[in-house]
């Protein structure tokens, strides 16, 4: 078989799969900023990274699985946390629950409605 034809077929096959890949729905630009701000506030309130880690969902881009609501009032995140390594325990044993409301533009913490023991 012609090497050039073989290479062209390989390229066509590899490119053919690209159309099947779907991009994740785009997030508002403010959402990842808001998520980072909320996570950093929880870290600060709970003793810093030496003694606290937020749930893994808060490290995902935009923290969509920790996002309770998105409205004209802002982004409300709710997540658990605990000492470093809590999520690797079996079963995971978080010790704290935090809710943080961040402005619609992702620039300011508007409120921390709850930060304390898991309810």
Describe each region flagged by the PLM:
Residues 1-8:
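Bacterial N-terminal signal peptides that target proteins for export
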Residues 8-16:
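Bacterial N-terminal signal peptides
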Residues 12, 27, 66-68:
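Residues embedded in well-ordered secondary-structure elements
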Residues 18-24:
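Sec/Tat signal peptide C-region and signal peptidase I cleavage site
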Residues 24-30, 41-45, 75, 79, ...:
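Central antiparallel beta-sheet cores of small beta-barrel/beta-sandwich binding domains
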Residues 24-61:
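Short, non-transmembrane alpha-helical segments in secretory-pathway proteins
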Residues 54-101:
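Exposed beta-strand-loop-beta-strand "reactive/processing" segments of non-cytosolic proteins
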Residues 93-119:
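A short, surface-exposed interaction/processing loop segment used at functional sites
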